[in-house]
Design a protein with these regions (language model features):
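Membrane-embedded transmembrane alpha-helical bundles that form the catalytic cores
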Residues: 1-379, 383-386
């Protein structure tokens, strides 16, 4: 807006901000995505390009031979985290959300704060830098809380994550044909739990260690698998990344008002497009491979589908569910059914789907869903002591 702190900034400040962000993104792309982008270009154009480490070339005295290898790019540890924090600092200072640090040592301390450097949480400048100039404080209660965070993280990592990986997940994934379908499915669910326990365990330990040093890091996970929809999941999973993407990517893209600077009358469409772009880039941030790109795209699509689904009429939802279930059942039958039975299968599927749809409609008219919801609320209130 015209009253925002950055609206009156001189053009030089905007140029320095843009230059800083471009350098940060350039370094991230160079070290983390060089192989990925090179492979994409080679696959699309049929070329034979190879990565070339310009920093090793300079370190060798502008020579391809020497102490450093020019044909390999070594990924610095934690680069995804601390470059995001560097961008957070420059953007927050530009926006007037935080005062600049007093010296280069304070800036280096913020960027390289070791507890969260490798696995997060991602700390924004306006959350951490003011703590640099506060007196150290560690009461008995805070000490106990810090120890709890550390022990909680160790239990998640050692007792849960590592145990599942060694005794179940690795065995099934290495030889899936030796196990039943149920065991393979169970291993997939266990892998989801392992990823959560591993990641959140590390961040819990980081929060506890930082607290012992007098610093407070934001909570990074809030029981994400209790979420009821994709939107809620991303408010509970890797919360520091979600907040970063919202503040420095989704809102600058236009939020629900515009897309890439172009105003849109349909705010829902604008929000959906920007959400998808944000999740797509968020997926790529997690790793330099198509798996993460697809994963980000699926999360973005899931959020859009949920938003559309949440606004639908109940009858339309039931109709779509009927068509979906009938289609899945039909597809399953067609895999083992001769072609001449195809029309019979479709007839059965449509009949069953229509029957289920009207059963749901009848139950709704009788008010059973409302009664069940009321009973559920009373039971929850009784359990919680309300």
């Amino acid at each position: 807006s015209s009253n925002s702190p950055q609206s009156g900034r001189p053009i030089a400040a905007k140029i320095w901000l843009a230059l800083s962000v471009l350098i940060d993104l350039g370094l991230l792309c160079y070290f983390k995505y060089a192989y990925f982008f090179t492979n994409v270009v080679n696959d699309l154009l049929g070329t034979q390009f190879a990565v070339f480490d310009i920093f090793s070339y300079i370190g060798n005295g502008f020579s391809e031979s020497g102490r450093f290898m020019v044909d390999k790019i070594i990924l610095p540890v934690g680069i995804s985290f601390y470059l995001f924090q560097v961008m957070s600092y420059t953007i927050d200072v530009y926006r007037g959300h935080v005062q600049p640090v007093k010296n280069i040592l304070d800036f280096g301390f913020y960027v390289s704060f070791f507890p969260q450097l490798v696995a997060g949480p991602i700390v924004r400048a306006n959350e951490f830098i003011p703590q640099l100039y506060r007196p150290f404080r560690l009461s008995r209660r805070l000490f106990g809380l810090a120890v709890f965070w550390i022990l909680n993280g160790l239990v998640k990592k050692i007792v849960l994550s590592d145990y599942l990986a060694v005794n179940l997940i690795d065995r099934v994934f290495e030889n899936p044909l030796l196990f039943s379908g149920f065991e393979n499915l169970f291993a997939l669910f266990a892998y989801s739990l392992q990823v959560y326990a591993d990641f959140s365990g590390y961040t819990d330990i980081a929060i506890g260690i930082a607290m012992l040093m007098g610093f407070y890091l934001p909570q990074n996970f809030d029981s994400p698998y209790k979420s009821r929809n994709p939107q809620e999941f991303w408010r509970r999973w890797h919360m520091s990344l979600s907040r970063w993407l919202k503040s420095y990517l989704y809102i600058p893209l236009g939020g629900n008002r515009s897309v890439l600077g172009k105003p849109m009358k349909n705010k829902i469409a604008a929000g959906n497009v920007n959400s998808f772009i944000t999740m797509l880039l968020g997926g790529l941030w997690h790793g330099a491979s198509w798996n993460f790109v697809i994963w980000g795209a699926l999360n973005g699509a899931g959020m859009i589908v949920y938003k559309v689904w949440a606004k639908m009429n109940w009858n339309i939802k039931m109709l779509l569910m009927t068509i979906l279930m009938g289609g899945l059942w039909t597809a399953h039958q067609l895999l083992a059914t001769p072609i001449w039975n195809m029309f019979f299968v479709w007839g059965i599927a449509l009949w069953v789907g229509t029957f289920i749809r009207y059963v749901y409609w009848w139950i709704e008219r009788m008010g059973y869903f409302a009664i069940a919801g009321t009973l559920r609320a009373k039971v929850i209130g009784w359990i919680s002591g309300g």
